Each structure stands twice: as C-alpha cells, then as structure tokens.
Amino acid sequence: MPSPINRTKIVKKKTTKFNRFQSDLFKRVGASWRKPRGIDNRVRRRFSGSRAMPSIGFGSAKATKDVCPDGFKRFVIRNVQELEVLLMQNRRYAAVIFHGVSAKSRKAIVERAAELNIKVTTPNARLRSEERE
C-alpha cells in the first residue's frame, strides 16, 4: 500500500453551522441556509450581534482541501481502465469504486489496483465471501 506524499496537518478553522435567518422563530422557515435578500435584513447588512453569513474566510486551506484524514484525495473509478489514470499519482489519490459497479467488476478493479499499487478505500465492499455454485 502506498503512503501519502505529504501528511500536512488538516486544520478545520471554524466549523460554524450556518442556519437560516429566523429559522429558530418560525417552524415554516427551515434551518437550511438561504442568503438573505431583504432590503432591511440585518444579517445581510452584517450588523453586530446578528448571525454570521458564509463567506470565503470560513473555507479550508488550499493545500488540505478535499484531503481525507488518511492523507489521500478521492478519485471515483467506474471501470478497470480508469485505474491507469492513477498510475503516476498513487501517493496523492486513492480510488473509490463507483456505487453502480457490479461485484464481478469490483473484484477485477481491486485486483488490478493491487498490481498497480493503488489504494482502494473500500476494497471489500459488496463482494461475496464465497461464490455461488
């Protein structure tokens, strides 16, 4: 199994949950974030004491964005031929098998990934332990 190319520490700056304005006051207003667009809205005008709006400052660092805790980025694989793309990038990307791939194709993908020294995130998913006879 390849080790990741660099294990920079993933820092989550501020994991604020952004709820919709007045979602705590009215049941009909869901908590899912919507940008306020009213002319008098105090959240849109960023008054002190009002809730924060999502902005670019809450984002992750560019070096660790989309990096999973094991140090790899994910790349979705649909067939055996797509593994060839990861041949030179096997220390940066890990393969994720697409959800609609059959068990027979999954087995072939996992075997080929082992030959190419590519990490597969869930190699045993949806594989039978014994074949039916």
Curated annotation (Swiss-Prot):
Molecular function via GO: structural constituent of ribosome
Alphabetical UniProt keywords: Ribonucleoprotein, Ribosomal protein
Bilayer-crossing regions: none
A GO cellular component entry from the record: cytosolic large ribosomal subunit
Listed InterPro entries: Ribosomal_eL32, Ribosomal_eL32_CS, Ribosomal_eL32_sf
SMART domains (alphabetical): Ribosomal_L32e
Protein's GO biological process: translation
Domain of life: Eukaryota
Keyword Ribosomal protein found: yes
Family that this chain belongs to: Belongs to the eukaryotic ribosomal protein eL32 family.
Protein name, entry field: Large ribosomal subunit protein eL32
Originating organism: Dictyostelium discoideum
Gene designation per UniProt: rpl32
